[in-house]
Amino acid sequence: MRIMGLDVGSKTVGVAISDPLGFTAQGLEIIQINEDQEEFGFERLGELVAEYKVDKFVIGLPKNMNNTSGPRVEASQAYGAKVTELFGLPVEYQDERLTTVAAERMLIEQADVSRNKRKKVIDKLAAQLILQNYLDRNY
């Protein structure tokens, strides 16, 4: 079963994919989106779904530290609803608190990546962490 992890932002969607057995998550790419112009990257997402034969989506849910809904929760849920509508696949949500912080820390401490390079990969790594957390919890 292949599961695709998504880190939905206002300008980008980080994409990760599980291995076929559901043990590990790997970052795939970052899809550029534009909420103001209603460009959400669904065409590219569809290409990846077909290429990797995806069975399910896991979308990061950006909750606040006190477990209340953050300002992006509704946007993530709306994106998930559209994904279900377009691809007919189930969507589950994974708490993504601190995943972007953890991703940035990994890039700084372990890879010594510059700020400009971090911006280019941070959402992909966050999607990978969201998906890996989901896999660790469920499989």
From Swiss-Prot:
EC number(s) recorded for this UniProt protein: 3.1.-.-
Gene3D superfamilies reported in the protein's UniProt record: YqgF/RNase H-like domain
Keywords attached to this entry: Cytoplasm, Hydrolase, Nuclease, Ribosome biogenesis
Name used for this protein in its record: Putative pre-16S rRNA nuclease
Its job: Could be a nuclease involved in processing of the 5'-end of pre-16S rRNA.
GO cellular component entries: cytosol
Compartmental location: Cytoplasm
Domain of life from the UniProt record: Bacteria
Source organism of the structure: Streptococcus gordonii (strain Challis / ATCC 35105 / BCRC 15272 / CH1 / DL1 / V288)
Pfam families for this protein: RuvX (PF03652)
InterPro entries cross-referenced by the UniProt entry: RNaseH-like_sf, YqgF, YqgF/RNaseH-like_dom, YqgF/RNaseH-like_dom_sf
TM annotation in the entry: none
Keyword Zinc: no
Entry's Gene Ontology molecular function annotations: nuclease activity
Biological process per Gene Ontology, one example term: rRNA 5'-end processing
Protein family: Belongs to the YqgF nuclease family.
